Amino acid sequence: MEQRQYKSKRKSPDTLRDWRKHTVQSDILTLTLNPALDVLTSIDKVESTHKMRCDHAIEHPGGGGVNVARVLHRLGASCVAAYMAGGVTGERHHQWMLHEKVRCHLLPITHETRESFSVHENSSGQDFRFVLPGPEVSEAEVQACFEYVAQHLPKQFLVISGGIAPGVPIDFYARLTRLANQHGLPVVIDANGPALHAALQEGVFLFKPSLRELSQLVGHDLPDERSWISACHALIAQKKAQVIALSLGEQGAMVVSQDQCWRAEALKVDVQTTIGAGDSFVGGMVWALYKGHDLLHAFQYGMAASAAALLQKGTPLCQPFDVHRLLPSVVVHAL
């Protein structure tokens, strides 16, 4: 892998407090509570006990909402990425966002932003991902985050993606969803666990579960396609979501609404990595909806963006050229 270096032009850590003053408004706001500086490398074979000489490491700003914003920026959407970050690692993460010219707002925290370490095994094509715990955030920092979102609600979509940081209340995503709903703002959420469950009680526009997460939500096994559709319809009938984009991994994906249901097989591409495919899917769908496309075409864009991300090494995410090149290859079947 090619080594990339980027030196911050700002002093650390004092200027972290200054970034809070910069406010921008947009059509789309993404929120990431527990971002990570993604460090990636590769090796021929992963072995236990032995010292393994890796290739040069590369860095990218990571975190669910951060990655969605990076995709939206590349595709040309008016988007701001807001994220909690702190310490030297947080500054490096922020500087990478500025380097990519993504409109962003750092919500400063006291403790150090985490790193995420991934190793690509060349011999097998597998990715080994090591995720460190996030920093503890204070009640005041959580409240500052909520106030920022409340004061800078976007015009079209609020995208909440990724897990909550230690110290963040379980109902925080639910509070944000309730706030957005009060203003008629659609919420797109890609999360898991109790924080997701609480948000769904408020009713979101769209969320993207895996098959395992969907099974946990409905409380029973989902052995076949019919059961998947039934589970999605049950959640929609309970007004937990208007649209469910069900990720099926190598089997593709499914999109279900109250009166529509489609499935698409995964595109056959030369897979370099699976990292970032899910975030690219969300970014592709939201971008298409932002541009006024209907749900079917948004699904197609999501599938194309996800496949385009598989072509990249590390987490560069999808590139617009590949998204538009792959789009005609996406075949969607109505169910």
Q: Model-found features: residue ranges?
A:
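Short, small-residue-enriched loops and turns at beta-alpha junctions
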Residues: P135-S138, I164-V168, A195-H197, A253, ...
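Conserved N-terminal subdomain of the carbohydrate kinase-like
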Residues: H50, R74-Q156, R325-L335
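Glycine-rich phosphate/adenosyl-contacting loop at the front of the ribokinase-like
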Residues: M1, K11, L16-A82, G90-E91, ...
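Conserved phosphate/ATP/ADP-binding segment of small-molecule kinases
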Residues: I170-D259
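Short, conserved phosphate/pyrophosphate- and ester-handling motifs at nucleotide-, phospho-/glycolipid
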Residues: L72, S210, G278
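Short beta-strands and strand-loop turn motifs
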Residues: R129-V131, K155-G163, D190, K208-E213
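Conserved phosphate-binding/catalytic region of the ribokinase-like
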Residues: H197, E225-L335
